[in-house]
Design a protein with these regions (language model features):
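Nucleic-acid-interacting cores, centered on viral/eukaryotic replication and modification enzymes
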Residues: 2, 74, 78-81, 99, ...
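Conserved catalytic cysteine-centered active-site region
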Residues: 8-22, 26-72, 105-143, 234-266
Length: 417
């Protein structure tokens, strides 16, 4: 499992509660540190959900954290070291420390700023908090949100063997730093590299026609004046270079706010929904694009609407403070199945679809249980805890009382060195 957060968890059960306890004359809880540390999102999944003894970790990449963890999972599967990886993020960021910090950076859409903007635009004096986050429109800053999201990645072999409901795939995640900077929080050149490389990945695997006709773009779209200029220029530039005439563009932050480390997972769910329903969520908080937004070869969706043609690729873009740029592309189940046809026989794919029927039935059943609050969350507290007496250790393997047989095989050979 690779999961965590971008900053830290800051609610009263974690960082805020820990730091406020002493000044307020209260005692810190033994859980405060555990809930504060970024990598504990993965640790709690390993300890209380999956019972995993496998590879784990967390990559912090500011606002690109989710895509950093996605990259770790994708590369682990491509290397053959794992066949199933859970990737994701969870961040409790809403609280005074976050607002104070981001406001000091000039990044927040504060009441004062939005009052001035609304008066300037003739929108009246009554603040409309539902329209505080305005990506690519006349805006004054971002809005903090909270979210949690996880995805299960599998090798194609394992997915077919277990009859998985394959909703799409990722080919690659491209990550680039900004190089030399003046302001550490300011944007740089790195996102040009990550976006351009991802466009090239799609063109290489699926061809120019598919890239040009079947793509949409889920922008980072924070709602800051600088982001609307820099990111729109990046997307417009590569849309022109790769011959895309009207690339659909949106930002889910207009509805969810900026969930920090989890922002990339928000984009994944938005992308999945868009490719499955052929409808894209719009930037519904702005009446029009700002004058300084680059629009050439782009089609910004300012309302929820259907695509005018079949889309099978959703680009996901993250621009994080410090120069943490990550871009990937979510491939639809339709194109994913075509990729599987290149690797597996018709008989193997038919067997997978047969197994998938049971998976879909179970999925529908569990969905109904969840909607009706009739399903309990998995919380394996103090179950199958292993100590020294539960391990059978030899030079060749480590066996546990729970049935796990871990072969001590090295990934290295002498020829590597």
């Amino acid at each position: 499992c690779f999961a965590g957060c971008a900053v830290m968890n800051m609610d009263r059960y974690s960082g805020d509660g820990l730091f406020a306890s002493y000044p307020m004359g209260k005692r810190a809880s033994s859980k405060h540190i555990s809930f504060t540390l970024p990598e504990m999102t993965a640790d709690f999944i390993n300890a209380y959900v999956t019972g995993s003894l496998g590879i784990t970790g967390h990559f912090i990449g500011a606002c690109a954290t989710s895509l950093y963890n996605l990259n770790a999972g994708v590369e682990l599967i491509k290397s053959g070291k794992s066949e199933l990886v859970i990737v994701g993020a969870a961040e409790a960021i809403l609280g005074p420390p976050a607002y104070i910090g981001f406001s000091a950076m000039g990044a927040m859409a504060t009441d004062e700023r939005m009052t001035n903007l609304q008066q300037l635009l003739g929108e009246g004096d009554d603040l409309d908090y539902t329209k505080f986050c305005r990506p690519f429109g006349d805006n004054m800053g971002m809005v903090c949100g909270e979210s949690a999201g996880f995805a299960i990645l599998m090798s194609d072999r394992l997915a077919l063997e277990v009859g998985a409901n394959i909703r799409g795939c990722f080919l690659n995640v491209n990550i680039n730093a900004d190089g030399n900077k003046k302001s550490i929080s300011g944007p740089g050149a790195g996102n040009y590299f990550s976006v351009g490389k991802t466009f090239k990945d799609i063109e290489t695997v699926f061809g120019a026609k598919t890239l040009q006709e079947k793509s949409c773009f889920l922008a980072h779209g924070t709602g800051t004046p600088l982001n609307r200029i820099t990111e729109s220029h990046i997307v417009s530039t590569f849309a022109k270079e790769f011959g895309i005439e009207n690339l659909p563009v949106t930002s889910v932050k207009s509805k969810l706010g900026h969930t920090m480390g989890t922002a990339g997972m928000d984009q994944i769910w938005c992308g999945l929904g868009a490719l499955e329903s052929q409808k894209l969520t719009g930037i519904c908080t702005i009446p029009k694009l700002a004058d300084d937004v680059f629009k050439e070869n782009l089609d910004f969706f300012l309302e929820n609407k259907e695509f005018n043609s079949q889309k099978d690729i959703a680009f996901l873009n993250s621009k994080g403070f410090g120069g943490n740029n990550a871009t990937s592309a979510l491939i639809s189940s339709n194109l994913t199945e075509k990729l599987l046809q290149r690797r597996f026989t018709e008989k193997e794919l038919k067997a997978w679809k047969k197994k998938r029927e049971a998976t879909l039935q179970l999925r529908e059943k569990n969905f109904e249980l969840a909607v009706n609050s009739d399903i309990e969350p998995i919380y394996e507290f103090d179950k199958d805890v292993l100590d020294l007496t539960d391990l059978e250790i030899s030079k060749k393997s480590i066996k546990t009382k729970t049935g796990f047989d871990y072969a001590l095989n090295s990934d290295l050979t002498k020829s590597d060195f």
